[in-house]
Regions:
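A recurrent domain-boundary module in secreted/ectodomain proteins
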Residues: 125-140, 230-249
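Bacterial N-terminal signal peptides that target proteins for export
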Residues: 2-13
Length: 295
């Protein structure tokens, strides 16, 4: 009887440890003087889950050698963070450094790089490591891993967490694109889908609606006709294109039998729904878009 009890207790502990490891954090946000948003959590940089492993987070952004940075797992201070440990650590390209949680070490020491540049950053919360290397694209500083469209014209309405993702293009990651069904209404562009309305938005230039401004008065774009649109945002040239696509032949009154469903990873690549690896995905079913998490 005692052996059975101990065996069951051990199995429960192993299961609990496995669950905790598989869900080390739901999000990872970069803050610090090394990134454009500084210490503003609202403007923190969103790292994206790897489709292969939900405990691996990736970002390609500009890091300033004159500042330091660390990682938050929530949108508030005083919770679980990942930092450098006992001393600040200057990261070396392609060399793994320890990612130390606040549960292990209370010292608020941070990471830095020796040269200002765009970097590929990979954080593995299972292995507790961080690896950086210079990104292939260095033409302009990269501020965002993605952008999100919100507003009454978008599928998610004014819910920032349900914003429609604009993904960076491969050749030029300062240009972001999405194809989305819009309705009559307003929209603007968020830089962080994890925080709130205190963040800085890309907004309509009142002198030219094909131009954007970053921050300032809350001038939004107006969509006057429901339809399927290609949206392209260029954060260097500060331009936006909202172009209605050609009709696909699908009626606006969709039924279960004629709705087309597609699944995409966070890189904007279409994937099969069979044998999905753990990670975050975007499902588009007709005019509806939702986020799916596979554990």
């Amino acid at each position: 009887m005692k052996k059975n009890f101990l065996r069951k207790m051990f199995c429960s502990l192993v299961l609990a440890a496995t669950v905790l490891t598989a869900n080390a954090a739901d999000r990872l946000l970069i803050v610090g003087e090394a990134v454009w948003g500084g210490w503003s959590i609202d403007n923190s940089i969103v790292m994206l889950n790897s489709t292969e492993n939900p405990d691996v987070f990736k970002a390609t952004v500009n890091l300033n050698a004159n500042g330091t940075f660390k990682f938050l797992t929530t949108t508030d201070w005083g919770n679980l963070e990942y930092r450098a440990g006992d001393n600040d650590v200057t990261l070396t390209a392609d060399v793994a450094s320890n990612l130390v949680s606040t549960e292990e070490n209370s010292n608020d020491k941070q990471f830095k790089v020796s040269e200002t540049a765009n970097y590929d950053i990979v954080c593995d919360l299972t292995a507790k490591t961080i690896v950086v290397k210079k990104a292939g694209y260095q033409t302009s500083p990269l501020k965002h891993t993605a952008l999100w469209m919100i507003g009454s014209a978008t599928p998610g309405g004014w819910s920032i967490g349900e914003g429609t993702m604009l993904v960076p293009t491969v050749d030029n990651p300062t240009v972001f694109k999405a194809t989305v069904n819009l309705v009559e209404g307003e929209m603007k562009i968020a830089v962080n889908n994890q925080t709130g309305f205190g963040q800085t938005f890309y907004l309509r230039d009142t002198t030219d609606e094909t131009k954007m401004v970053f921050g300032g008065d809350d001038n939004k774009w107006n969509i006057t006709k429901a339809g399927k649109y290609d949206v392209t945002v260029d954060v260097v040239n500060m331009t936006i294109s909202i172009t209605e696509t050609n009709s696909s032949g699908i009626s606006s009154a969709e039924s279960a039998s004629n709705v087309s469903t597609a699944l995409y990873d966070l890189g904007g690549n279409r994937v099969s729904s069979k044998n999905l690896r753990p990670g975050c995905y975007i499902q588009k079913s007709g005019s509806k878009i939702k986020k799916i998490i596979v554990k």
